[in-house]
Amino acid sequence: MGLSDGEWQLVLNVWGKVEADIPSHGQEVLIRLFKGHPETLEKFDKFKHLKSEDEMKASEDLKKHGATVLTALGGILKKKGHHEAEIKPLAQSHATKHKIPVKYLELISESIIQVLQSKHPGDFGADAQGAMNKALELFRNDMAAKYKELGFQG
């Protein structure tokens, strides 16, 4: 289910826009995730107390974590599917320490797509959206495979 060179180019083009302001993109992705799927907030001890969007926007920790998430994802996307070395430790920590189910990876992928649509409509047309969806699905499938190897049923 790999992506063509052209699809990877579409993914990386829009990702360049994300990298121009990783903290605000990451913050918006997490806020959308937590507002749309409040159950995901329970996995984050640091953020459980944040109930309103205003509280989330004011949280430097949330902004920092959003930047961490998108920086890691950017490193994976730049590998164009050759991301075994990046996926392994990420799956290890998300399966054994954080216990993040694959379903939550789907939910954050949806939030990423929504943020890209909102912030970069001119650079994120149907072709770019399709390519990004494929890239995120590849990431999730590889995370799920590692989870399985680790015996995590998430």
From Swiss-Prot:
Highest taxon, organism lineage: Eukaryota
Gene3D superfamilies, A to Z: 6.10.140.2100, 6.10.140.2110
Keyword Coiled coil (UniProt): no
GO CC annotation terms, alphabetical: extracellular exosome; sarcoplasm
Molecular function in Gene Ontology: heme binding; metal ion binding; nitrite reductase activity; oxygen binding; oxygen carrier activity; peroxidase activity
UniProt protein name: Myoglobin
Residues that coordinate or bind heme b: H94
Family: Belongs to the globin family.
Assembly with partners or alone: Monomeric.
Record PTM Phosphoserine, positions in chain: S4
Pfam families the UniProt entry points to: Globin (PF00042)
Domain Globin: 2-148
Originating organism: Papio anubis (Olive baboon)
Job of this protein: Monomeric heme protein which primary function is to store oxygen and facilitate its diffusion within muscle tissues. Reversibly binds oxygen through a pentacoordinated heme iron and enables its timely and efficient release as needed during periods of heightened demand. Depending on the oxidative conditions of tissues and cells, and in addition to its ability to bind oxygen, it also has a nitrite reductase activity whereby it regulates the production of bioactive nitric oxide.
